[in-house]
Structures are given as structure tokens and as C-alpha cells.
């Protein structure tokens, strides 16, 4: 790996830059495969941020130090390199007095950002893989320090003008004691590199650069905890004092640069005088999240993922009209109703986004009484609630006043047997559709009781033929059409297997009725929860689908089968958006190929490795390892991930067009509603995507606590593009370009609204 190292404290120095030599020496000793280039300011350039000295031509000097030096002595400076460096663009002379294994320091009379820029573009014939900026003498935590930091500025320059990954490193000393022992600097170097290695290996795709802070405390060790931490949004006070008046002759002109008698303002920062910004984010005040400043004060290591940008305020876009028009929202009786339980997983992401984009609109928890006659013409009410809480009469009668988060009719997609019929009808008319290969062969049967299975198969002779064809090595999966959370799913091969499955359902129902206990069949060890029993007579509709026997398996995840959960948002009639931050949900156990001689269709232990629904995994086990963000899976190459997402976009496009065109009775998108669906996909060993099912009101809490930010961003985008235009029609004109993770795949009008 080729690494460029810069800083803002300058070259090795007891007074100004005591940390960089031990840090580089540690890299040289422990990572000899790293090809490092050191390019730093020729003197200390702290507090300059990402500045350049515009108009100034910069020059270079070169100094050299021993790899095993115990002090900050060096050879030089020289006006050109004294040793030959691999892939260097610079001319050199061979100086016999300087050993070949010395550390070369390239000193530029500019800023850290200039050093990064020159280093990336003008020093080497080979590109760099990483830029390390630091270690800074002192912490770089909080908005006040980070925005001023030359260390962070050098890293940011690497991203903006070099498109190179960068990490800013800062070593935080305490009680003003910046000179610490060599042993402590060695520990700080090791721990810094531990964090750097992890970040490089697990680089977040949405992150441009990282800022890490290492506490210089005697307790620093391999056990010192590391925390992702947001920047403390603080505010400071003046960092100068004065004016100081020393005017011996107020009429004198400045000569020879002597300004000692002028009015002066002296550098005098008060490092303890900080306070919270008024914009300090609410979620950081609940004390469940420590800021970078709090982490380092707790003598732990902070890691702050950053974008190389001065963050804009996303909800203020477009033309600024200095008229009363922009205040109209606050002069109406517009209302937002959020009737879901405040303890629900999605309540905070939803209300946070609503307050962010629609601060003028009041949020209440109950829908007020109003009707078509009593509703003001300009009044608009957006109601977010469970399906049963929404007023479907108002949704139909007041299309200009009442808006909801759900359509009324969408069985064509969310009921498995309806979905199968929708796709089969559409592909019959459109054989070139991706759905032809992306939806596994499926059949539907209606069954009241297990003993009527033979009659049901007589009515579906194509299915009977498939099941009786012993020459085929197909396996099948049976699912109740109207169940969710994995209830009633079983894998089988023959008609006898299917009969045994339905008989077991009836047996379980009978036993539960006799015992009065629905939990009798649960696994006593809690490893796999048999909460997926069903009552045949209550569900009646079943889908039988070809089982994918060659799923993509990942060695890094113990070869456990997984499916992708993708959130799809439909707006009006009809725009469809795919949220590209997808989840991968893994089965509890490693995948075991199906063996007709070993597999028991009624033994839930055999089923455990085939079902990826985390709802079926024991509450006694930690489920964190079963849910990952899809983009974080390193074993799948990036080009494969991109292709998988492209397939998902195409499948989503076709399945929603299918519903709106061939099954309009059962999918009726409305102009005054939107809806979020959880769409599940499988990937086979050839990286081909298969559509599993579409869920209305998906179980967002499967995402878990660690990936909550994924849901936060989803609701931010949903409110921005689906709710804000309800109250501000101007947003309809400016939303042609959505956020990169919120991809529009359909823009279609089916009813002329």
C-alpha cells in the first residue's frame, strides 16, 4: 500500500512536532510493505484549516533522519533529494553520508493542504492508496477545532483534489502535558495503526475521511475502547484579546516592516470556554451517543466519519422568495397527524424528519373531526398511522385535503397468491420482462383442511404433475399467502411431504386447543422459535414455489443463506423509489444442501438453515450478526453489488408496472397517498436476483439498533420527497434529482390525475 503522510506541526521537532517521528518509525518497523512518502510543512502551520497561500510559489527542502533515532536530529536541509526514491518524479543526487534506509522528509513552505496536494500529484509516478495526516499535537474534537485544524484540512484536501481516502490522526494530551514518554508514544502509534487498519479494511462507502483522536494517558492499551462519535457542535468565544495601544507617534508611517508600536490584538484562546450550539442535534442530547469531545475526555478513542464538505442545510433549496408567499404555511390550518405509538422503532426517525422539513406544521397524535363540508379549501392534513388507524373514507372523499402513508387496495403485490397471478399475467403479455427469470416458478392452491389436499391438487393439475415428476430434482417451498414473519413456511419435495406438512399444522392446532397453550411446540432451548405455526382453515390460500437450491453463500458469514431486504417507496399514481441502502438478513445456521434421505419436512431443526427471516430466530440470542448493511459485505465485489442493485431496480420497475397494468382492481395507487414496502430478494450462486415477496408496513425494527441510521436516512428521504410536496407544491418542481440512495425507477401516470 502506498501511503502519503503529512501534518500541520511540521517536521520532527522537540518543541513543535514531537509525535511524528515515533509514529513514522512505528510504521517502518511494523509495516515494511507500506511504501510511505512524507511531505509536511517546513514549519508549524497549525490552525490554518484547508487553506492555500494563493499566489505564492512554493519551494521544497529535504531532510533525513535515522529509522532507529531516539531523538529529533537530522541531516540537512538540502535543496534536492539526497537518495534515490522509488517512483519519485524528482531529480536527486547520491549523498554517500546519508544511509539508504533513512526517512526522507520533504518540506514545503506552504500549508498542510498544499503539502497533500503536491504530494498526491507532483511527487510520485504511482498513485497513493491512503493519506495519513498527523499525528497532530493535541486533540481535534468539536466543530471549533476541526474547522480550524490544518491536520483535518490536509486530509480533506486529499479527498477533494486527490479523490484519495484520508485519515486525520490527533493525539490528545491532558493537563497541558504534551511531552510524554517514548513508551506512551509507542502505545499511541500502535493503537493508531490498529484503528487505521480497521478503517481501511472496512471503509464506509458514504465516508470521505475519518478523524481519529487517541488519548495520551498511561492507561492506553489494546483494551482501550474505540467509539464512532459525531462532532460536538459547539460555539466558542474570541480567541484574541486587545486592543493593545502602543502609539508613540500616531502620524508615523510603517518603515522596514516595524509595526511594534501599532495597535495589536494578541493570540489568547481560552480552550475551556466552549458551549453547545443552538443547533446541537437532539439525538446527541439523549446521552446514548457520546460526541467526539466526550469520548476523548473519557480517555477512549474517538472515530468521526466525515464528508469532505461544509454541510449544507438540505431542506432549504431552490429560489429564495422575499415575499409573504413563504409564510403561507404558517397562516393555514395545515396539520400532521402521527398516530403510531411513540415507543415504536420508527417514531423518532419519522418525527425528526417531519420537524426538519415542515417546522411550520403542527404535529398531533389524534385525527381531528372534519368532513368535506367543514374542511377549509386550503387545509391539508397528512396522517401517518397503522393501516387500521387511517380514515379510508376521507382518503377517497377528500383527495385534496387528506393524505396518508398507505394506499387502500394493494393486494396485487402484498398477498403472495395475488403477486404470483400478477407476475404470471404480466410476463405472459411481456415475455421479455426481467420478471420472467427473476420470479421462481409458482403455483397457488386453496385448502380448508389437510385431508382435502388431494382434491386441491386435482384442481391444480400442473402442480400435481410437477410434484409427481420424479425425474426432476426440484424442491419446493410452501407459504401461506396472507401470513408474515415467516409463519407457516416449509420446504418439501413430494406430495407425501406436503401432506405431512399440512397434517402437522392440524396436529399442532389440535394439541394447542387441548392443552390451552400455544407455546407447547416451541423449542425449549430457544435456538429456533416455532412461532410460525398456522391454522389452515383460517388462512386457506397457499403458494407453492420452486425452492432456490443454489443460494449465494459467503464464507465470511459461515456460509449462511441470506436474503436482501430493500425498501421501496411509492408516491401518488405513480412514482416509485428504490432505497439503495439495503439490508442482508442471514439464517441462523450454515446452509446445508437438501437431502431427501436426511431432511425431515416436519423437523424445524432441519428448516433452520433455510429460513432467513430473523423473526424466527430466538430472542435469547444476539441477532446482530444476522443483519448487515448489504454494502458493508466485503466478500461481494463492488461491481457485483452494483449489478445486483441494477437488477433490483429493473425488477421493481416491472413488478409495479405489472400491478398497475394487469391487476388494477387490486392495486390502486392514489394521488393523495404514498406507501413504503419491504421487498425481499434472493441471490443465487450466479449473482442472479430473484424476487421473493413484497410486504406492506414492513417490520423496520428488524434493522436493529446498530443500523438505525439506515432507517433515519430512509425516513428523511421519504418525508423530503413524499410528504413535503403535500404542503409545498413548489417542491414538486424541484425533485427531479433525488438523493443518491433514493433512486426513482418509475414515473408513471395511470389514471390521468
UniProtKB/Swiss-Prot annotation:
Enzyme Commission number(s): 6.3.2.25
Residues in TTL domain copies: 343-734
Additional detail: Present with 1770 molecules/cell in log phase SD medium.
Disulfide bond sites: none
Protein name: Probable tubulin--tyrosine ligase PBY1
Single Gene Ontology MF annotation: hydrolase activity
EC category name: ligase
Function noted in UniProt: Probable P-body-associated tubulin--tyrosine ligase.
PROSITE patterns to which the protein is assigned, alphabetical: TTL
Amino acid at each position: 500500500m502506498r501511503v502519503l503522510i503529512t501534518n500541520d506541526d511540521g517536521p520532527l521537532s522537540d518543541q513543535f512536532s514531537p509525535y511524528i517521528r515515533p509514529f513514522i518509525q512505528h510504521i517502518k518497523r511494523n509495516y515494511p510493505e507500506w511504501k510511505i512518502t512524507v511531505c509536511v510543512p517546513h514549519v508549524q502551520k497549525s490552525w490554518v484549516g484547508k487553506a492555500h497561500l494563493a499566489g505564492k510559489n512554493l519551494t521544497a527542502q529535504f531532510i533525513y533522519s535515522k529509522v532507529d533515532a531516539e531523538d529529533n536530529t537530522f541531516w540537512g536541509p538540502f535543496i534536492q533529494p539526497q537518495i534515490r526514491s522509488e517512483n519519485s518524479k524528482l531529480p536527486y543526487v547520491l549523498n554517500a553520508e546519508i544511509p539508504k534506509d533513512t526517512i526522507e522528509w520533504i518540506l514545503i513552505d506552504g500549508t498542510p493542504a498544499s503539502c497533500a496536494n503536491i504530494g498526491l500529484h507532483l511527487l510520485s509516478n504511482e498513485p497513493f492508496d491512503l493519506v495519513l495526516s498527523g499525528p497532530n499535537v493535541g486533540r481535534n474534537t468539536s466543530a471549533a477545532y476541526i474547522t480550524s485544524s490544518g491536520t483535518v484540512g490536509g486530509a480533506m484536501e486529499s479527498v477533494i483534489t486527490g479523490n484519495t481516502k484520508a485519515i486525520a490522526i490527533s493525539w490528545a494530551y491532558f493537563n497541558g502535558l504534551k511531552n510524554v514518554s517514548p513508551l506512551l508514544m509507542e502505545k499511541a502509534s500502535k493503537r493508531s495503526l490498529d484503528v487505521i487498519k480497521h478503517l481501511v479494511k472496512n471503509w464506509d462507502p458514504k465516508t470521505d475521511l475519518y478523524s481519529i483522536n487517541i488519548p495520551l494517558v498511561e492507561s492506553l492499551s489494546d483494551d482501550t475502547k474505540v467509539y464512532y462519535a459525531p462532532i460536538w457542535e459547539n460555539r466558542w468565544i474570541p480567541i484574541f484579546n486587545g486592543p493593545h495601544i502602543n502609539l508613540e507617534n500616531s502620524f508615523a508611517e510603517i518603515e522596514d516592516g516595524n509595526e511594534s508600536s501599532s495597535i495589536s490584538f494578541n493570540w489568547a484562546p481560552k480552550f475551556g470556554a466552549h458551549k453547545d450550539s443552538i443547533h446541537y442535534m437532539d439525538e446527541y442530547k439523549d446521552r446514548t451517543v457520546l460526541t467526539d469531545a466526550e469520548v476523548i475526555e473519557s480517555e477512549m478513542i474517538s472515530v468521526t466519519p466525515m464528508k469532505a464538505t461544509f454541510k449544507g442545510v438540505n431542506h432549504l433549496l431552490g429560489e429564495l422568495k422575499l415575499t409573504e408567499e413563504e409564510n403561507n404555511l404558517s397562516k393555514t390550518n395545515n396539520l400532521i397527524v402521527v398516530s403510531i405509538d411513540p415507543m415504536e422503532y420508527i417514531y423518532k426517525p419519522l418525527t425528526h424528519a417531519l420537524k426538519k422539513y415542515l417546522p411550520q406544521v403542527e404535529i398531533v397524535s389524534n385525527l381531528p373531526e372534519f368532513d368535506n363540508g367543514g374542511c377549509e379549501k386550503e387545509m391539508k392534513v397528512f396522517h401517518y398511522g397503522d393501516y387500521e388507524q387511517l380514515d379510508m373514507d376521507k382518503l377517497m372523499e377528500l383527495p385534496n385535503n387528506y393524505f396518508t402513508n398507505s394506499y387502500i387496495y394493494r393486494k396485487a403485490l402484498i398477498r403472495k397468491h395475488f403477486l404470483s397471478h400478477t407476475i404470471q399475467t404480466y410476463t405472459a403479455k411481456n415475455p421479455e420482462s426481467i420478471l420472467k427469470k427473476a420470479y421462481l416458478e409458482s403455483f397457488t392452491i386453496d385448502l380448508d383442511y389437510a385431508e382435502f389436499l388431494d382434491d386441491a391438487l386435482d384442481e391444480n393439475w400442473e402442480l400435481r404433475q410437477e410434484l409427481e415428476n420424479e425425474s426432476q430434482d426440484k424442491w419446493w417451498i410452501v407459504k401461506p399467502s396472507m401470513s408474515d414473519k415467516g409463519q407457516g413456511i416449509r420446504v418439501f419435495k413430494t406430495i407425501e411431504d406436503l401432506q405431512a406438512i399440512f397434517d402437522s399444522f392440524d396436529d399442532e392446532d389440535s394439541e394447542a386447543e387441548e392443552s390451552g397453550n400455544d407455546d407447547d411446540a416451541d423449542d425449549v432451548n430457544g435456538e429456533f422459535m416455532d412461532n410460525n405455526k398456522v391454522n389452515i382453515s383460517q388462512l386457506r390460500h397457499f403458494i407453492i414455489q420452486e425452492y432456490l437450491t443454489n443460494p449465494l453463500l459467503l464464507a465470511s458469514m459461515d456460509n449462511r443463506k441470506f436474503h436482501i431486504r430493500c425498501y421501496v417507496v411509492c408516491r401518488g399514481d405513480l412514482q416509485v423509489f428504490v432505497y439503495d441502502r439495503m439490508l442482508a438478513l442471514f439464517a441462523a445456521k450454515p446452509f446445508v444442501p437438501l437431502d431427501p434421505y436426511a431432511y425431515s419436512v416436519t423437523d424445524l431443526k432441519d428448516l433452520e438453515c433455510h429460513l432467513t427471516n430473523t423473526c424466527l430466530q430466538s430472542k435469547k440470542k444476539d441477532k446482530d450478526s444476522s443483519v448487515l448493511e448489504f454494502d458493508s459485505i466485503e466478500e461481494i465485489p463492488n461491481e457485483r453489488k452494483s449489478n445486483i442493485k441494477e437488477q433490483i431496480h429493473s425488477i421493481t420497475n416491472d413488478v409495479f408496472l405489472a400491478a398497475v397494468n394487469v391487476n388494477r382492481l387490486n392495486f390502486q395507487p392514489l394521488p393523495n397517498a404514498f406507501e413504503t414496502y419491504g421487498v425481499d430478494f434472493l441471490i443465487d450462486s450466479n449473482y442472479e436476483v430473484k424476487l421473493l415477496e413484497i410486504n406492506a408496513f414492513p417490520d423496520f425494527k428488524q434493522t436493529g439498533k446498530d443500523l438505525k441510521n439506515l432507517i433515519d436516512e430512509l425516513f428523511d428521504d421519504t418525508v423530503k420527497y413524499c410528504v413535503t410536496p403535500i404542503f409545498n407544491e413548489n417542491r414538486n418542481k424541484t425533485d427531479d434529482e433525488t438523493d443518491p440512495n433514493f433512486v426513482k425507477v418509475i414515473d408513471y401516470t395511470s389514471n390521468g390525475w
